[in-house]
Amino acid sequence: EKSKSLFTFPVFFKRNPYTKVIRNKSKKFIDIIQSKEIDYDLKSGECDCGFFIFKTSKVRKLVKHLINKKMIFSKKSNEVEFLSAFKYIRKLGKITTVNAKSEKDTIGINFKKDLIWRKFP
């Protein structure tokens, strides 16, 4: 069955999340914020797991436009912030989240040493 979502990603509810999904009253995705970009602590909330599935051509075209227009650059680090594109992506199509099974799913892999605890089949 073909998904009607433009963009899908897993989330997990936790304390002190690095990122937090913002939803409206009917639980639809609105935005995602990062603790490093705000001036207050995130006490709890749904965070992303750093894994995203999307319809590449539409999202890539939009993200390229957002970068060219300097609309998704971090105010603090001047880096491109992919998560900042989500509020624009949702205007193109449906964003769906699925619940991750454990908090381990939210741990990022940024360095080779981060793979040590992972068990692969």
Describe each model-derived feature in a short phrase:
Residues 1-73, 100:
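Conserved core of the sugar-phosphate nucleotidyltransferase
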Residues 45-121:
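Conserved alpha/beta core of the MobA/IspD/sugar-nucleotide pyrophosphorylase nucleotidyltransferase superfamily
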